[in-house]
Each structure stands twice: as C-alpha cells, then as structure tokens.
Amino acid sequence: MVKQTDQGQGASPTKQPLKKLAEVRDLNFYYGGNKALKNINLPVYEKQVTALIGPSGCGKTTLLRCFNRMHDLYPGNRYEGEIWLGDENPRNLLQMDPIEVRMQIGMVFQKPNPFPKSIYENVAYGLRIRGITNRAVLDEVVERSLRNAALWDEVKDRLKDPGTSLSGGQQQRLCIARALATNPELILFDEPTSALDPIATVSIENLITELKDQVTILIVTHSMQQAIRISQFTAFMYLGELVEYNDTMSIFTKPVQQKTADYVNGRFG
C-alpha cells in the first residue's frame, strides 16, 4: 500500500494552500517487454520541490523521464496511464506531441551538457527554435535567466566564450539557465550534483531552493541528506513501485511502510 497525502509541511513549510501542478495516474512503463514502472500514482505540487529517492534501478529516473517523454527516443518503449500537467488547463502529457511537451518541461541532467555554442547562445537556443529572433528580447531573457541561475555576475563580460570553457559547477548553472529561458512550468533534475564537487553541490542546492519560488521542481537524488535539505515532498521507490509518498519530514522521521523505514535508516540501498 502506498502512503500518500494531499497536503504536507515538508522540509521548508509552505504557508499557502497547495495546488497540484502535475499528477501521475495509474502509470505503467515498459522497456520492450520489461515492465519498469508499476501502477504509479503521484501528485507534484506547484512551486514545491518533490524528491524521488530509492536504490539504484528502482525506477526513479525512468519515472522522471516519462514526464518529458524522453523514452520516446527509443523504439519499443511503451506507456500506459496518464500524466497530467497544468492546474487551470490540464493536459495529458502522454497524448501530446513530445516536442511540445519538452517546450513546457525543462530538464537538467547528471553531468553538465552545455551545447557547443557560446554562453549566450546556450541560453538563447530554446527561444531561437521557437522563432524568437528579436535581439532585445533575447538579451533580456538571457540576462534574466543567467541571473536566476546565479551565474550572470560570473559571465556577463564573457558571453561570447564557449559554454564548455566554464567550470563544472558553472556549466550546470548554465544548463539551469538554459532550462529557465523558455519559462517552463516544471523542471526535472536528474541527480544534478552527482558529478560536482562539494562546493558546487552546495551552490546548486541553494539555487534549487531559491528557484522553487518561481518554478515547480521534480528531482531524482541518491542522497537522502540532499532530499532532506531541499525538498518539501519525497517519494520512495523500490523495484518499479512507489512504496510511499509524503511530506519529506514524515518520510524521514515517521515512515509508514517498513521498506521505507529500512531504506532511510540505511539498512539497504
């Protein structure tokens, strides 16, 4: 049985009534004939950080990539169920054009992956493929996105330099700025600090904490301490199933399911 709550207080208690931005309903996912996700039901609350935790191979990254239809890139993969996005105008992401889905949902990967372009063009890229060419508009969005990613002051005098010339932590913040530039409703983070040093990790965690006031965040993390530090809600997954979902503090201090208690207390994983 999955423990769920419709309201929660989380690691950083919210003062406002919570609204669902997204919701997974009865989701199954297959890699060919292999059933990787089993009857997943999960709410994602607006302007909150929701963490997906669990041991390697539990399905958390598989679930994350269902949101922006990344699995469509490989033949033989198959979805069953629904993933809804939007409060006032809900859309089933599994019935939309994948390109349109990715315009509404940003993603930041484990390893920084700046495009082989300048810092400026990395951020402007998403706008250009939408047909926006006005230089003043591009300049405004690039600066705003870099500021929101806490990178502007470090790169404002070198916007023509390659994105790959930045340090690892700076490259990851550049990727976050690139995701922010298209004004997404949801940003997916797939272990965004796993390839970074401790100082860069703190910087990214602080940035995520600040960004939740602007955008909803769903993050996969192997670090339970990271989930405690930055998330308001946590979902524990095991063998393709959602075992327990609740506000983060409840998951870590008073889990309902024994499997959850064993995992968060380090008995396996």
Curated annotation (Swiss-Prot):
Localization per Swiss-Prot or TrEMBL: Cell inner membrane
A GO molecular-function annotation: ATPase-coupled phosphate ion transmembrane transporter activity
Main location: membrane
Residues that bind ATP: G54, P55, S56, G57, C58, G59, K60, T61
Membrane topology: Peripheral membrane protein
GO biological process assignments: phosphate ion transmembrane transport
SMART domains: AAA
Domain of life: Bacteria
Family annotation (InterPro entries): AAA+_ATPase (IPR003593), ABC_transporter-like_ATP-bd (IPR003439), ABC_transporter-like_CS (IPR017871), P-loop_NTPase (IPR027417), PstB-like (IPR005670)
Substrates-to-products reaction catalysed: phosphate(out) + ATP + H2O = ADP + 2 phosphate(in) + H(+)
Enzyme Commission number: 7.3.2.1
One cellular component term from this protein's GO annotations in UniProt: plasma membrane
Function: Part of the ABC transporter complex PstSACB involved in phosphate import. Responsible for energy coupling to the transport system.
Protein name in UniProt: Phosphate import ATP-binding protein PstB
The protein's assembly and partners: The complex is composed of two ATP-binding proteins (PstB), two transmembrane proteins (PstC and PstA) and a solute-binding protein (PstS).
EC top class named in words: translocase
Pfam families to which the protein is assigned, alphabetical: ABC_tran
Similarity field: Belongs to the ABC transporter superfamily. Phosphate importer (TC 3.A.1.7) family.
Keywords: ATP-binding, Cell inner membrane, Cell membrane, Membrane, Nucleotide-binding, Phosphate transport, Translocase, Transport
Highest classification ranks of the organism: Bacteria, Bacillati, Cyanobacteriota, Cyanophyceae, Acaryochloridales
